[in-house]
Regions:
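Membrane-embedded alpha-helical bundles that constitute the cytochrome b-like, heme-associated redox core
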Residues: 1-190
């Protein structure tokens, strides 16, 4: 597998960032669902949110790297089997996934810094609080964070189902290209 993307397939960096993001998103979603079940006297009550915040800030950095990488190493050319509607739907779906990722991280940041305190990322460094208002900010951002999380999980699951549909029903190379396999069916614009 090549380092950079080619017209036929994704490179190792893009594939690693894609799968790592997916694992982190589902792990963070599970952690978030578990955190809200903890009682004040549970040993993880204070520790779990700190882990959640730290991973969230690292995910933000990874997303920035991912976007820079995407500009440096553009994705493979669309398969010839894709209709114009399929290409437009894929572009819209990917944009929505990126927007939701940033929205969920920003809303999480606003929850975490509403009290004016910075976010400590595993004790390595701190992300300063910029916008602070301990009252409404935390409540509004918390509601948005919840909705963004559910939306992201539902849309990313749809993304996965669509990739599987391409692989098993359409029998095209969509999924293969994200796993490092090359495609000969690329480049035409319908």
């Amino acid at each position: 597998m090549q380092f950079k993307n080619t017209p036929q397939r994704y490179g190792v960096v893009s594939a690693a960032l894609h799968w790592l993001t997916a694992l982190v998103v589902y792990g963070m979603f599970a952690l978030g669902l578990w955190m809200v079940t903890l009682s004040y006297y549970d040993g993880w009550y204070h520790q779990a949110p700190e882990i959640h915040k730290s991973i969230g800030m690292l995910l933000m950095m990874a997303l920035i790297v991912r976007i820079i990488w995407r500009l440096y190493s553009p994705p493979p050319i669309a398969l010839t089997s894709y209709s114009r509607l399929t290409r437009a739907g894929a572009a819209a779906g990917h944009l929505l996934l990126y927007l939701l990722l940033f929205a969920i991280i920003i809303s999480g940041y606003l929850i975490s810094t509403a009290d004016g305190k910075p976010i400590s990322v595993f004790g390595w460094f701190e992300i300063p609080a910029t916008l602070t208002d301990a009252g409404a900010q935390a409540d509004i951002a918390g509601t948005l964070h919840l909705w963004f999380a559910w939306s992201l999980v539902i849309i990313s699951l749809s993304h996965g189902v669509i990739a599987l549909k391409h692989h098993f029903i359409d029998k095209d190379d969509t999924l293969k290209r994200m796993t490092g396999m090359s495609s000969s069916d690329y480049g035409a614009q319908k």
